[in-house]
Regions:
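Conserved Class I S-adenosyl-L-methionine
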Residues: 219, 223-250, 279
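Class I SAM-dependent methyltransferase SAM/SAH-binding core
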Residues: 83, 89-91, 96-140
Length: 279
């Protein structure tokens, strides 16, 4: 997989705003290009299964938010259902299915992505999990009247414009009967520098992981920014390891709250003391 390639060096991300005061919303990620290198894209989807468990911290999110919703469904005598919006290569859907099985919970997971390249790859690498992958957008499921016990996404929010963010969050509220939790990066200089060092061995690899990952950090929110962008009913929850969640628990989810584990309790929003905060 390592070879010379025409991908731009990650150092170009330091040309502007080196202190990460502002979101880099105008810089596109390479893998979002419909004409991007298909080999690099395939390699990137494959590496997501290695990198996301290390950087996305989904296990505590599953324990605190998703598992209680699945247990509530089990008490009603039915399988729990999870919708993964923007599922990419399906690594999060596969992980949640495995964790639920270990917890003795029956779960049906649907992964959706408007990019057919993602859903094709996810379906081809499902590894017997049995998740359903569909090439469509969240508003299509709203129109179909579908509902799920938990609606999730991974590293999606920073890709969206303000209008798209509002639309996806509105769809998430309509689609969940329990909890909606969107797990994303939290922008900071420390996160950027750590990722720059950690992915240095991939600097000349035929993958998008390094360039797009560094850009994703620059595009992501700080807690105060996300709070201002969220509509009523949503809250920004700061997590360890440079993570930031957008969480909604509706009326149907109130009973779920009591079943939450005391695992990785979200920190208070410490925007003022964020080590990456400069303004």
């Amino acid at each position: 997989m390592l070879r010379n390639n025409p991908l731009p060096h990650a150092d170009v991300l330091r040309r502007r705003d080196p202190l990460l005061r502002h979101r880099s919303v105008d810089e596109p990620e390479l893998m979002d290009d419909p004409a991007c290198d298909p080999v690099a894209l395939d390699n990137t989807y494959r590496l997501f299964g290695v990198i996301n468990p290390l950087v996305a911290s989904w296990r505590p999110v599953y324990r605190r938010y998703v598992r209680p919703a699945l247990r509530a469904a089990a008490r009603e005598g039915r399988p729990g259902t999870v919708l993964d919006i923007g599922c990419g290569g399906g690594d999060v859907a596969r992980a949640i299915t495995r964790w639920a099985a270990r917890d003795g919970l029956d779960v049906r997971i649907t992964g959706i992505d408007p990019d057919a390249r993602a859903t094709r790859w996810a379906a081809a690498h499902d590894r017997g999990v049995g998740a359903a992958y569909r090439t469509l957008a969240s508003h299509d499921l709203v129109a179909a009247g579908e509902r799920y016990d938990a609606v999730i996404s991974n590293h999606m929010l920073h890709h969206l414009t303000r209008e798209e963010l509002s639309a996806v969050l509105a769809d998430s509220r309509r689609l969940t009967r329990g909890v909606a939790v969107h797990n994303d990066l939290r922008r900071s200089r420390a996160a950027w520098l750590l990722y720059w060092v950690a992915t240095l061995p991939l600097a000349r690899a035929r993958v998008f992981v390094r360039f797009d990952g560094l850009l994703s950090i620059r595009r992501s929110y700080r807690p105060g920014e996300l709070r201002q962008a969220l509509p009523p009913g949503w809250r920004a929850v700061q997590q360890r390891f440079f993570r930031l969640l957008a969480v909604h628990t509706g009326q149907d989810a109130e009973a779920v709250q009591a079943d939450r584990d005391q695992v990785d309790t979200p920190q208070k929003d410490r925007t003022q003391s964020d080590p990456g905060r400069t303004s």
